[in-house]
Amino acid sequence: MARIILTAPLFYFFFSLLSHQTMSQPQHMHTFCSVDSFTQTSSYETNRNILLTTLSLTSSLVHYLNATIGLSPDTVYGMFLCRGDINTTSCSDCVQTAAIEIATNCTLNKRAFIYYDECMVRYSNVSFFSEFESKPVIVRYSLRSAPNSNRFNQTLSNKLDQLIPNVSPSTLIPYFVEDQERVTQLEGSYDLVSMIQCSPDLDPSNCTICLRFAYATVSTCCGVPSSALIFTPKCILRYRTFVLPSPAPSPSSLPPISPTSSPPLSLPPQLPPPLSQPPPPLST
């Protein structure tokens, strides 16, 4: 099971069930549409639609793109960001679906976000490039508690300390790092699979701030879940845990078998000694 937490001041939430959605399609998490709007058939609408088409067409090539369409006052700024652990086909499917739905759900809204479990798409009448943004945030997390929950937050924090310095524009997928580690503790062992990702328009300092914010969001809102996926406007944090079965005890660790003495054998009662001569015959 999963639960979703969202924070969206200055935005209202618009939810649409996709009647055509199948299991192979990306999972829609939430859509946020701004209150301010534009008029139908305006230059802003034309630029918005061109922007969304541009994002859709480019998503088969890269995991991230930002774009600017049109002249002031009708300029539209937009971007998409796909999770780095999915392939370009899945990225393209997600962005194309998101672009259609954001235009449908936020028909005349000047600003909008749409979050899927594999990507996010947004557009705005105000430039947002190179800036850290904390809202809106979406968190999907497991209702199961993390293994060794008393120590898990520290374990995850330490893992972030290790991964964040490795976020770099020179990686195969820019600003994306993933890791798998086996954690062994007295309470038991588990595999911790982690991924962090920043929008490439962020500098390293703002990337670190964004990832720390994402971690703080899940650790304060949701207890100690065994898995979580956090989307912010500029970064993604995901982790999962897989508990390992307890190993069977080795023979050397089994308690020794205590020797037991066998009960004494019981002998049959002693027979009377044999007669020295046969008894006389009976008289008739």
Curated annotation (Swiss-Prot):
Record's subcellular location: Secreted
Domain of life from the UniProt record: Eukaryota
Secreted as UniProt keyword: yes
Region Disordered, annotated ranges: 247-284
Keyword entries, A-Z: Repeat, Secreted, Signal
Domain Gnk2-homologous positions: 26-128, 134-244
Cited Gene3D superfamilies: Gnk2 domain, C-X8-C-X2-C motif
GO cellular component, one term: extracellular region
Pfam hit, one: Stress-antifung
Intrachain S-S bonds: none
Signal peptide positions (record): 1-24
Family as reported in the entry's similarity comment: Belongs to the cysteine-rich repeat secretory protein family.
Name of the protein described by the UniProt record: Putative cysteine-rich repeat secretory protein 7
Originating organism: Arabidopsis thaliana (Mouse-ear cress)
Gene: CRRSP7
